[in-house]
Structures are given as C-alpha cells and as structure tokens.
Amino acid sequence: MKRWLLILILLLPLAGTAQNHAFDEFYQSYAAETNVRSIELGRKMMEMMRRDADPELARLLDGIRSIRILAAQKPYPFLFRAQAYKVARDKAFELISRTDSKGPSVSFYFIEGSGERLSELLMLSDGDEEFIVLDICGVFDVRDISRLTQLGITSPAADGKP
C-alpha cells in the first residue's frame, strides 16, 4: 500500500504538466513549417513589457507565462485548421465566446486553473485568407481576460478594424 501511495505522489506533479500537452504538441509540430508564421513570447518578454505598462496591465502581464501564435495563409498546411479545432475542443477547454459576424470567425476557449495552477486561453481566428491560433498561458482567470478587453487590448477582428 505504501508503495502505491508513493507512486501516486510521484506522478501527481505530472498531472499539472500534462495540462498544456495537446497545444504544446500542436505548436511544436507547426512552428517550424515554412508556410506557417510562429511567434513565441516568454516570461522575460512579459517582464520587459510590464516595465512600461500602466499598473493594471502590469499586474495582468505579471501572471502571463507565455504567448504563442501560429498563423497560416491559404492554402493551409495539411490538417493545420482541423487539428487546431481538435485541440480547442479538448474536454479540458470550455468555449467562452464565438463571433461569426463580419470578418473572420473568432472563437475563444479557456481552461481555468486554480491557485498557482496555470490557466490557458486559446483563440482561433478563421478568416477567408488566414487562420490564426493564439495561446496565452499563465496564472489568471476569466475576470483578467475581461480586464484586458477593457484596457483596449483586443484583436482587430473583435473591434471591426482591418
């Protein structure tokens, strides 16, 4: 019995690291593709951006661990779009918003962590000519995402500007 308890305790930290597993695999498989643009902003970049930000934005940036973006124009790499939607429809993600009006279809999916557990926001922007996947990972909640939009940090698709 003690051995099983020890094994369980040793495997418990792996449960937290598996949270981003699906998107990590997706990002790594397409980041090096020649016809996919990739951007990755790490924790150090968040620290640099925080220095010049107003206090509210600085507080939000403090919780962000990484921002990763993949963008591809038509014709997309084989399965790129389908696999992105498959990651978003993972049982851990919850759809929090979808817009299908003028411009690209934009969907937001969210996994909310608790305490020091990482949360993740995934945005899929499905336009006529371009498909964009944005992933924000860190310690934040839905209210923090709402504050970002109140600070005017929105996607061009969300505010109707090209």
Model-based region annotation:
Residues 4-14:
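Sec-dependent N-terminal signal peptides
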Residues 20-80:
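Early exported N-terminus immediately downstream of N-terminal targeting peptides
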Residues 33-36, 42, 62-64, 90, ...:
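Extracytoplasmic
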Residues 77-91, 134-136, 145:
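Surface-exposed flexible segments
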Residues 85-113, 158-162:
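Short Gly/Thr-rich strand-loop-strand
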Residues 109-142:
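A short, solvent-exposed beta-edge/loop patch
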Residues 131, 135-162:
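C-terminal partner/receptor-binding element of secreted or periplasmic proteins
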